[in-house]
Curated annotation (Swiss-Prot):
The lineage of its organism: Eukaryota, Metazoa, Chordata, Craniata, Vertebrata. It comes from the Eukaryota. InterPro entries: Ribosomal_uL13, Ribosomal_uL13_CS, Ribosomal_uL13_euk/arc, Ribosomal_uL13_sf. Gene3D superfamilies: 6.10.250.3250, Ribosomal protein L13. Belongs to the universal ribosomal protein uL13 family. The modification N6-acetyllysine is found at K191. This is Large ribosomal subunit protein uL13. Keywords: Acetylation, Citrullination, Cytoplasm, Phosphoprotein, Ribonucleoprotein, Ribosomal protein, Translation regulation. The gene is Rpl13a. It comes from Rattus norvegicus. Phosphorylation at Ser-77 upon interferon-gamma treatment in macrophages involves a DAPK1-DAPK3 kinase cascade and is causing release from the ribosome, association with the GAIT complex and subsequent involvement in transcript-selective translation inhibition. Citrullinated by PADI4. The modification Citrulline is found at R59, R140. The modification Phosphoserine is found at S77.
């Protein structure tokens, strides 16, 4: 991958810790990483246990002045961001610079809806988790601990998927028309094609 290129990852169906570890390493190496669809990230273990863990984390606060921290993020993207932060030396200049190279998003807002999204096989649930094992969705966990935008994100995702379907249909139609056009003119241009092939201009 080119040095200045942005790596766009689709968080859906990836395990939280494994994905965070890989992302942390990449940002430390100097790559810019964007993680979309954070609400679709999975956590191993059943939902109830994960919720109890998060509720226990919500109780951790500074007794005399809770506004001083620790801060408890509710959005799935911020929960993932904090997980990555825990894997970085974020109190050093190097760690801070690495964290600035990471961008996390709920859903797939523009311009990332038009960009090619990658997956990380080493962090995929289907690869890493036995089919019988229980797992939880980060989006549901976030919603139950105070994230207010689950419905909004879901609606926007439905709209995006509909647009993508229309775009794909148009693309297929154009490809079909192009093939047909090529077939139609094949006989007319065959002699020119032969000349181009003999001169090595057409493979």
């Amino acid at each position: 991958m080119a040095e200045g290129q942005v790596l766009v990852l689709d968080g859906r169906s990836h395990l939280l810790g494994r994905l965070a570890a890989i992302v942390a390493k990449q940002v430390l190496l100097g790559r810019k990483v964007v993680v979309v669809r954070c609400e679709g990230i999975n956590i191993s273990g059943n939902f109830y246990r994960n919720k109890l863990k998060y509720l226990a984390f919500l109780r951790k606060r500074m007794n005399t002045n809770p506004s001083r921290g620790p801060y408890h993020f509710r959005a799935p993207s911020r929960i993932f961001w904090r997980t990555v932060r825990g894997m970085l030396p974020h109190k050093t200049k190097r760690g801070q610079a690495a964290l600035e190279r990471l961008k996390v998003l709920d859903g797939i807002p523009p311009p990332y809806d038009k960009k090619k999204r990658m997956v990380v096989p080493a962090a995929l649930k289907v690869v890493r988790l036995k089919p019988t094992r229980k797992f939880a969705y980060l989006g549901r966990l976030a919603h139950e601990v105070g994230w207010k935008y689950q419905a909004v994100t879901a609606t926007l995702e439905e709209k995006r998927k509909e647009k993508a379907k229309i775009h794909y249909r148009k693309k297929k139609q154009l490809l079909r028309l192009r093939k047909q056009a090529e077939k139609n003119v094949e006989k007319k241009i065959c002699k020119f094609t032969e000349v181009l092939k003999t001169n090595g201009l057409l493979v």
